[in-house]
Curated annotation (Swiss-Prot):
Its EC number is 7.1.1.-. The gene is nuoA. Its main location: membrane. GO terms for cellular component: NADH dehydrogenase complex; plasma membrane. It is a multi-pass membrane protein. The chain crosses the membrane at residues 8-28, 63-83, 93-113. The lineage of its organism: Bacteria, Pseudomonadati, Chlorobiota, Chlorobiia, Chlorobiales. It catalyses: a quinone + NADH + 5 H(+)(in) = a quinol + NAD(+) + 4 H(+)(out). This is NADH-quinone oxidoreductase subunit A. It is found in: Cell inner membrane. It comes from Pelodictyon phaeoclathratiforme (strain DSM 5477 / BU-1). It holds the Pfam family Oxidored_q4. Keywords: Cell inner membrane, Cell membrane, Membrane, NAD, Quinone, Translocase, Transmembrane, Transmembrane helix, Transport.
Length: 143
């Protein structure tokens, strides 16, 4: 029990020192840096060209879906790499565990594919319009 607490104490001390070093560096830089704002420093820099328009551009949500799927499978590789290095020592049970892990991810990919989340060009939905009222007003209900 003492050895386990000692190991957790080492991890906690390592994390605490990491936070102290990051916060200390940030605070030291903030206190020592000169503050001389001017229009040239506050403008957006784009490869030496003057910025045109707004930087807030709407991106298609499909880019995010593709990026998330890439990250999921990239993390899968990170998890499977250590397993692959000691594959012969772990035996059959570890192989089954890795196959189940990969299978769950493949099922998730198949679900996203069947749902249509991976289709780059989606058909526009055909939404029927409300019939117009005889008085010329739209389909709003009157009370």
């Amino acid at each position: 029990m003492d050895q386990t607490l000692s190991n957790f104490g080492n991890v906690f001390a390592f994390l605490a020192l990491g936070v102290v070093f990051v916060a200390g560096g940030y605070l030291t830089a903030r206190m020592l840096r000169p503050s001389r704002p001017n229009p040239a420093k506050n403008s957006t820099y784009e490869c030496g060209e003057e910025a045109v328009g707004s930087a807030w551009v709407k991106f298609n949500i499909r880019f995010y879906v593709v990026a998330l799927i890439f990250i999921i499978f990239d993390v899968e590789v990170v998890f499977l790499y250590p397993w692959a290095t000691v594959f012969k020592q772990l035996g059959e049970f570890a192989l089954i565990e890795a196959l189940v892990f990969a299978g769950i991810l493949v099922l998730g990919l198949a679900y996203a594919w069947v749902k249509g989340d991976l289709d780059w060009v989606r058909p526009t939905p055909n939404i029927p319009k409300m019939p117009e009222m005889p008085s010329g007003k739209s389909g709003a209900l009157r009370g």
